[in-house]
Regions:
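N-terminal, polar/charged subdomain of small-to-medium soluble alpha/beta proteins
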Residues: 1-95, 106, 110-114, 118-150
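Short hydrophobic/aromatic beta-strand micro-patches
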Residues: 100-102
Length: 150
């Protein structure tokens, strides 16, 4: 069971309650919630906010691929996974991503949650622009839309 979505920050905030409603089931004995939030310091620069941009269709496709790969690589068939990522400007402390997983056992839930966030960071086409207290801003290194074959 999978739910994926890119959420425009102008329209809605990410919600732990939405994630909990989606993954809750008597079939599962373990739930893990991961949230990423905008922090105030990165690379010794004082951050005031971040704009997230993405290629929405390819991001959703990458989330779906990661979910399917988890079946093969982790051998966790019975699971519920909720992934939402924000798009647009976020202030300090606001959530940029929610990953919620439910599995039969806690060890499965921990492994699955970690696998999902690490794979998203490696390959989903999501980019962020940080804004700093000195009125400067920088686009940070992100993932390309097409990965080069070596």
């Amino acid at each position: 069971m999978l739910h994926t979505k890119i959420v425009d920050s102008k329209d809605k905030k990410l919600s732990i309650n939405d994630a909990e409603r989606f993954i809750t089931s008597v079939e599962f004995g373990a739930s893990i919630f991961f949230t990423g939030t905008v922090r105030n310091l990165n690379n010794n620069k004082s951050v005031v906010g971040i704009t997230y941009d993405s290629h929405d269709e390819l991001v959703i496709k990458s989330f779906e691929e990661i979910y399917k790969e988890a079946d093969k690589k982790l051998n966790i068939q019975d699971k519920a996974v909720f992934i939402e990522h924000a798009k647009g400007y976020l202030n300090l402390g606001e959530m940029s991503i929610i990953i919620a997983v439910a599995c039969k056992h806690r060890d499965q839930a921990y492994v699955l949650s970690r696998y999902i966030i690490e794979e998203i960071k490696k390959r989903s086409p999501i980019w962020k622009k940080e804004y700093y207290t000195d009125n400067q801003s920088d686009w940070l290194k992100g993932n390309p839309i097409v990965h080069e074959k070596i």
